[in-house]
From Swiss-Prot:
The protein's name in its UniProt record: Putative F-box protein At1g31072
PROSITE patterns associated with the record: FBOX
Organism: Arabidopsis thaliana
Pfam families: F-box, FBA_3
Domain F-box: from-to ranges: 4-53
Disulfide-bonded cysteines: none
Length: 193
């Protein structure tokens, strides 16, 4: 059977239902498949359906206050739901931005409700964070300690603190693990002049 005829044989309601559940980026890319798909995905009916479906998908939102700055850092991620007991939940932060800080609370949003998550240690986020396998990692300072890695497990809503002696503003995802790149210089650059 011809591929074009196979695609045309998909009932429009099934097509719309499938595409209304996809992320916006995937829908946008799918518009390039054919003129028919672009027409369907660009229709007002599909846009309204997609908006309705998007607003029913719960999302997580994290707001973190930096130590010395006038901005709050926001991270957003799809809410992990585990329909089967033995399945693994993987969450990735797909959006982050900064806003002027207006309050000092750490805020957690799940679905349409907001709540504070009590952190056992006062700390001040520094720089951008990363999300690996459902855990948000970010650099923070605390009292006399210049930097540490803070992890927040989205699924269990638990904080962990990892003390390190390196001075850097960046975490990197290396093979599923957060690493903190450090550059140590031994000697003087004058020897290379």
């Amino acid at each position: 059977m011809n591929r074009e005829k196979t695609l045309d044989s998909i009932p429009i309601d099934v097509f719309l239902d499938i595409f209304s559940r996809l992320p916006a980026k995937s829908v946008g890319r799918s518009c390039c498949v054919s003129n028919r798909w672009a027409s369907i995905l660009g229709s007002q009916d599909f846009k309204e359906l997609f908006l309705t479906m998007s607003s029913t998908r719960p999302r997580l939102l994290f707001a973190l206050k930096p130590y010395n700055g006038d901005e709050c850092l926001f991270y957003s991620s799809p809410h992990p739901h585990n329909h089967y007991e033995k399945s693994t939940v993987v969450v990735t932060a797909d959006f982050h931005t900064k806003f002027p800080k207006s309050q000092s609370d750490c805020i957690y949003a799940s679905g349409l409700s907001w709540r504070n998550i009590q952190c056992p240690l006062t700390h001040y986020p520094q720089g951008k964070g990363i999300c690996i396998n459902g855990v948000l990692y970010y650099l923070a300072s605390h009292d006399e300690k210049p930097y540490m890695i803070v992890s927040f497990d989205v699924r269990y809503e638990k904080f962990r603190f990892i003390n390190k002696k390196c001075h850097s503003y960046e975490l990197i995802n290396y093979k599923g693990n957060p690493i903190w790149p450090c550059l140590y210089i031994i000697g003087s650059f004058s020897h290379f002049a």
